[in-house]
Amino acid sequence: MKLEVNFKKTVGKIKPMNAVNNGPVYTDNGDQNLTNLPDFREANIPFARTHDSSICYDYGGEHTVDIHNIFTDFDADPYSPESYDFTLTDIYLGTIMRAGAKVFYRLGSKIEHWPKHYGIMPPKDYQKWAVVCEHIIMHMNEGWANGFHMGIEYWEIWNEPDFNDKCWTGTPEEFYDFFATAAKYLKARFPSLKIGGPAVCGYNEQWLDAFFEKMREENVPMDFYSWHCYGSKVSDFTSDARRHRAMLDRHGYTDTESILNEWNYVCGWGGDGWKCSLETEASLKGAAFIAAVMSACQREKTDMLMYYDARVNSSMNGLFKRGTLDRLKGYYSVKAWGELLSLQDECALSCDVPDIYSAAAADGETQMLLVAYYTDDAAPLPRTFKVETGEDRLYTIYTLDEEHDMEPLETIASDNGGFTLTMRPNTVVVIK
């Protein structure tokens, strides 16, 4: 068994697999001013999606991002700046950009688990809703209403409309009509921007076939298609990546980007399973899982991954400790991918070692290999295998385990173009 990498052979570009949902927190107040903005910047996080931002007080809570939070009275004049409240959204998006990330803007509402709903009902007037979105985009990108020129490229229509009544209270057919109306209007108004969605919560073939049939009938443009997946096996994500790509291609959307923009470790959604999920997400095993999924999806026909969630008050945040914002183990996997992303060129590799997931990049000066040993087995054992690079040189091993946070632990001299590596279960190493 071996892992073979050829740093001299480029096979493509490293994709933005370390994007996240939500951004850092920052305030210039004199007290209660903890921030993880420098951590974001250091990790080279490329995009931050603004879904569920309004759940978080630190981002502006119920006065930020969501359409009904910005345009609070749907009967108001959508062409009047006085009808909009941009204040806290402007600050939040500015913080994301200050951290070096680009904004991926979700148009719609946060999820609503409550018995009473406020922002997930079908709009009274689909065309007017699209006009409201138009003016939000104008404010962010064209300076309208004392706005900005942020250059936000991705604009996503809605979130999880296929997820019972927590995100959309209308019928599927109502959503198809709504999406078609909004997408066609916004793409005609902003042809250079990427308009897409709808951030489906899973692979429901019946729902998706009907959705795409409607889109084709209406000639609805779709620059990107977004979908979600949660699971405990890497194959959960790679198999869904293939199914969603096949769905797009089957319906003629062959040039549409496929973006997995919610994902995380979940072994159960209730009771002990949910508790295990949350504990794992914040653990070293969760960090190995992050590195494994990013590495595996790099080789799938998926254009971007967006981890859920970097929201600072989220129980599913495996990157930053709630309250203190200390780095958790998962942060170092995201940061390691940020280094690969900065090198740009993906290098050829192959691996037949079970439960070993890897990705490699180089830029002419630096060579980097990311290796994750991820397993969901109850009693896994260490794995020893050969790493073949075809070069005789010194390599530094950086280790992420319970005792170390991606620190350089040893230097290995390759012999006859390779060396032997032993990894403990659910650890990650970077080799440079």
Region locations from a protein language model:
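Mature N-terminal, pre-catalytic/accessory segment of carbohydrate-active enzymes
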Residues: 1-43, 51
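Aromatic/acidic polysaccharide-binding cleft in carbohydrate-active enzymes
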Residues: 264-358, 363-364
